[in-house]
Amino acid sequence: MADSGASVPSPDLPDLDSLHASLSLPDIPSVAATSLSTSLPAISAKVSGFPSFSSHLPPPPLLSPPTPTTMVGWIGWVFSLVFQTIPSVLYWVITFSTITLPTWLFTLFSMSLTFTMNFTTLLLIVLGLVSTVSWFIRYRFLNMYSRLPPEPQRKEPQLDLFPDVQEGDSKPGLANYLDEFLSAIKVFGYLERPVFHELTRTMQTRKLIAGETLQLEEEKGFCLVVDGLVQIFVKSMRSGKHGLNGEVIEGSSDEDDQARDGKQGYQLLTEVKNGASMSSLFSILSLFTEDIRLRASEGSSSSMSSVQPSPARTTPAPFLDSPGEMLNGSPMVLPRDSEVDSSAINGEAEPLPPVPPLHLGESRASSYHPNGQSTASERVRGNRRKSVHPDIVARAMVDTTIAIIPASAFRRLTRLYPRATAHIVQVILTRLQRVTFATAHSYLGLTNEVLGIEKQMTKFTTYDLPNDIRGAALDRLKDKFLKEKDRLGSEEVTRGIALHNPYAGRRRRSMSFVRKEAALKAKMPLPKRPNSLINPERPFHGYDTAGVSPGDLLSTIQLSRFGPRHDQFATTPRLHSPLTEKERSPLRRSSLQRKDSVDEDALFRESILDCIMKGIGLTPSSHNALRKGSHSGELSPKLVSYDSRRQKAVFSNNAFGFIDAYEGSGDGDTESMMSMSVTSAGGTSPIVYLREDLLNDIEIVYFPKGAVLVEQGERHPGLYYVIDGFLDVGVQVNEKGDDLVGASRPGHAQPDEELFPTLKRTQTATSRGATAAAPINESKRKKPSRKSLYMIKPGGMQGYVGAMASYRSYTDVVAKTDVYVGFLPRASLERLAERYPIALLTLAKRLTGLLPRLLLHIDFALEWVQVNAGQVIYHQGDESDAIYITLNGRLRSVHEGKGGKMTVVGEHGQGESVGELEVMTESTRPATLHAIRDTELAKFPRSLFNSLAQEHTGITIQVSKLIAQRMRDLVENPMTEQGEPGNTGSVKTATSTLNLRTVGILPITTGVPVVEFGNRLLSALQQIGVTDGVTSLNQAAILNHLGRHAFSRMGKLKLSQYLADLEEKYGMVLYIADTNVNSPWTQTCISQADCILLVGLAESSPNVGEYERFLLGMKTTARKELVLLHADRYCPPGLTRKWLKNRVWINGGHHHIQMAFRLTAEPSHPQTKRLGTVLKQRVQILQAEIQKYTSRRIRQTPIYSAQTPFKGDFHRLARRLCGRAVGLVLGGGGARGIAHVGVIKALEEAGIPVDIVGGTSIGAFIGGLYARDADVVPMYGRAKKFAGRMGSIWRFALDLTYPSVSYTTGHEFNRGIFKTFGDSQIEDFWLEFYCNTTNISRSRAEYHSSGYVWRYVRASMSLAGLLPPICDEGSMLLDGGYIDNLTVAHMKTLGADVIFAIDVGSIDDNTPQGYGDSLSGMWSVINRWNPFSSIPNPPTLSEIQARLAYVSSIDNLERAKNIPGCLYMRPPIDRYGTLEFGNFDEIYQVGYAYGKEYLQKLKSQGSLPLPEENEEKKKLQRTLAPRRASI
């Protein structure tokens, strides 16, 4: 039994084990599993009915969870989990969701709950709920404008004044004698090494003790101070008015000299310090031209008559290969009295023998005289008779060392280096005009003295035509013009009719031919052929040459190639030289034409050319002297070249290389060709080429009576020779002459490039002569009275001085009668002067001979000063001793306030002066003056004023006018010390954009298309008409002009002078930095710029670029402006701020320009490999992109499209740079300001561009809308939407608050403005914009041009009491109209030339009041409602407060109306109230109708500055550009 009992549970044990395993889940603790296993035997014992046998059986060994080593245990555990645990969990979930949860819900919903409350409680709960929702919407959703990231106004950059290391007036880096000397001879311009050594070889020094005097009248040389201080005195009295050479000047009308009582005192002219010259510009000219003859007629005729037999007067003698030989080989014998006169350039009084002596000294020159005599004694006697320093005495203040270059050195330099001499003379003549003539004419009113020089010059330049062509031939010429005059209209005739020139068509071909032949000849051997060039058989001349024979000209060919008049055809002489035969081939074809049609015209041209060349000093004797100079040029070490292959290299930088600053030759070898052909010893003179050129260029022109040939202030177009008729030379009486110093003349537009020099006159004369284009403007322009000075008769020349020396005309030239003139363009004269130095030397000699004594003394006192970039000229608080006139460069006046704060007072460009007021009042300097870039100045000492005032009392009147004008400017624009940034913005940019002469275009980083940008800007500047034209320069242009050594150390002097001449010639020069960062051209662009445009791509990274880092490293103080190029006409909000944030050096503003460009950056100089493949791929890509848009049926037009060309972005930038910006000022007036929208639409329809927008109150709102997109359509829509919001009475009522500060919270007003502008910033606007506010915390007006638009527009519209002030950086801002409701004055400071000012403010009630000394409020109310009362109603309390607030605004409004250039407009909107925004359409129509009517009235009066008129004139000039109306 026991065994059976023991064996019964054994088969159940595995089941128990499986049960144990199934109950022992992995997550059950082991303790629970153990207790369960211990209770299992007891349970099994109860079930089986047996007593417990646990004590008899051992515990089961397999009751623990299966281990990983037991595979069967794992399988059992998994089966238990799947088939038992998971179903149990699912069962529980289903039971809870279907039974338990519904039961709970049923129980909950079956319960009853009752709440009891009154209506007040319910209403409070609802109000609380609504308030919560309203608060959330109001303060969390609708006022996002208050949670914008803070963007304060951009502070104006602090001015960088780099420390000045120089003391006072000391020169930079002067440490020794040589530096002092080099500083003094800078007046000569660029000197190459041989010229410099030759000039200084015989220099002497002299020591003066303190108090010692030196009679400069006895000194014959160039004097300069090396060390010490010298005072220059002038003798105060002298009988008569003498010229430089001691001769009494004719026509001088200075009665003051005879009115003296005979005092022989001395007046202090100036003080000369270290490194300055004691000689004047005129005295230097006289040293170079001591032996030049003034008039060629007597000398040439006598010499020619002595040379030629009397029957041969009809056959002029050509110029020989050897100056000492005649046609038959016999030596020339010149009379004694003509020996000195025939020597034109060298200092010797006799012609050199055929083989020049191999020496350089002048002392042995007399031994080579053919007669064995020397004229040195005569020269000494002549020098004693005349002095280059008349009446001048120098006194040393301290022990002084002076250096003297004797006159012999200048004579030797003239003989050895004629072209270098001509270059020096050209430089001095240019500085003479800029310094002495301009100062005397403009500042001192010495118009008669300056203009008298040109009047007296006519006695040297008048040559009559031969008699045989003044009779029937001239009548036939007139008949041709009369026929053409009848055919053409009056307007065409006024511009001039030119006779057809048959040679003009071959002009360019012959020029290239000349260059080739010159190169050929330079490589040819130089044979000795004394007279083989000239053919003994000369054609017969059928006309008399009693006056001037054409054969007297500088030519190796027969000039009169026409036979007798009865001959049917003309023939050309046969020249033995193959080279000259080749030269003559172009003209041979033209000569075989009908004699009666072509030859007569050509004869006129030949004769006119004869007279012109005699007038300018090109005569046989001068040619002989030139040939001597050429022979002696053999001695020049620079000219010796033993390798013909290296000749080109030798002469590419020769000492005679005259820098032609005005003629941009496309041939880089032109200069060297000229040098070789002119200065080669022996050989054929290239005069034949020049002769051919001049015949090609000369024109015969007819002008009717009243036509203007030259306008006052313009550069001379060329030389006019009067054939028949009279020219009247005069000046405008009301002309102040300020423009003659070089300042800009806004009303005078000239073309930019002289592609057709012969048409220069027509391009300027049409503005006066043509009356059909703009009759109103022309009649108004002719209103100023004109004063006639003198007349030019037949045989006279006009424009000799101006055209030869490239001066501007001080007079205008009008045809007194119908006049026939020969015209030689200025470019031809410049070519002539370049090849033949005698022309400039003759001009210089004549100028020095005609100089009045007064101008000579002024020239002595004026000092030419050159300062470096950043150099301080004088400091604030220094003693004022001189006035400074800017000749070239740019200056800036800076006022240093409290705490070292720098404020820009003004900038002074070319032609402007600074310092008059303090010099005249003997006060200290009010500001520091420093040079922005390398600058040339004319220093006008105060001692000169004192001397002139005592001796010439008439000058004091002119000086008094000058001081009065400066005082008036100071009163109107006081230089007050502004300590706050809000108002200094207008002062810092006071005159910074006026008179900009150079603009540098610099990319921010590589890949910016600056070349394309520069070309488009150049085109825009040309279209708007820059005074004197505009040109652009890049590295290729510079290398083409000056060669590959332009940027070397030696070439920098050439480059600087070339750039200075360009800036003097053109009104504006663009420097395009199209090279690498560290290239010399990039450095030149930065150092030469008055204003630097930093160009960047708006969508690219705003990080600082490599070009900017290079710019900052150069430490330039020029004005810097940022230009952002956009592919589309849109600027995302905040983009501009990112660019300006890291660029504190941008001190001139920024511009948004739309320009299509490639988004992929390209290097400045891409490699040329696979260029064709790359271009082909790019073209294909561009075609595909274009076809994507052009193939669509519907083309989406942009929001804005410029309807007129001058409304483009480049034209806007061009007007800003030229100072011709158009400003729009919108005044405040509440709802009446809706009329602004209508007026702006009228301006748009009239085609008037707007460049700057400023506004006050509602004007700030409308102006901001217009400046944002520069279009009327979005402005109209947004303005109407805003007016609808403001017209809602409910919005106003919901915004009411307790009136502790204001009646409304301002939220609805803020929301209306913010919904219009969004988060845009003022910097992102397409047009420049500003608005003004009243800072009641600091009691001043502020102008805002940066920051969030909505804030400052809201501040400008904040009426006191209605809206709370806007808080800005701790200050409270209110409506700007309280101080200035029409900000015309501030707009003027931003550079606007024409300002449209629209005033919509309320009109003050000026009704006289008479209610007595006391006033009852009750009576006032009754009187207001009494219709029968005749007493006007007294103002209410609110009206009195309003009038009090606008007191200063009314005063500023009256001033604004009188500001020059302001066009005041006031639409008839007085019947509308300040808050009547509901009448939007009606007020808009009133403004639109008024604007159209006003602009039409201005247009009919000719007062509208419409760019269309200028464009019309430019189109007219462009149609004239190819040629005048020709026969």
Swiss-Prot record:
EC annotation from Swiss-Prot or TrEMBL: 3.1.1.5
Gene Ontology biological process terms from the UniProt entry: lipid catabolic process; phosphatidylcholine metabolic process
Binding positions (a nucleoside 3',5'-cyclic phosphate 1): 682-809
Catalytic center residues: 1257 (nucleophile), 1375 (proton acceptor)
Disulfide bonds: none
InterPro entries given in the database record: Acyl_Trfase/lysoPLipase, cNMP-bd_dom, cNMP-bd_dom_sf, LysoPLipase_patatin_CS, NTE, NTE1_P-loop_dom, PNPLA_dom, RmlC-like_jellyroll
Biased composition (Polar residues): 364-377
Transmembrane feature ranges: 74-94, 117-137
Record topological domains on the Cytoplasmic side: 1-73, 138-1527
Protein's name in the database: Lysophospholipase nte1
Subcellular location: Endoplasmic reticulum membrane
Organism: Emericella nidulans (strain FGSC A4 / ATCC 38163 / CBS 112.46 / NRRL 194 / M139)
Placement of sequence motif GXSXG: 1255-1259
GO CC term (a single one): endoplasmic reticulum
Catalytic EC class: hydrolase
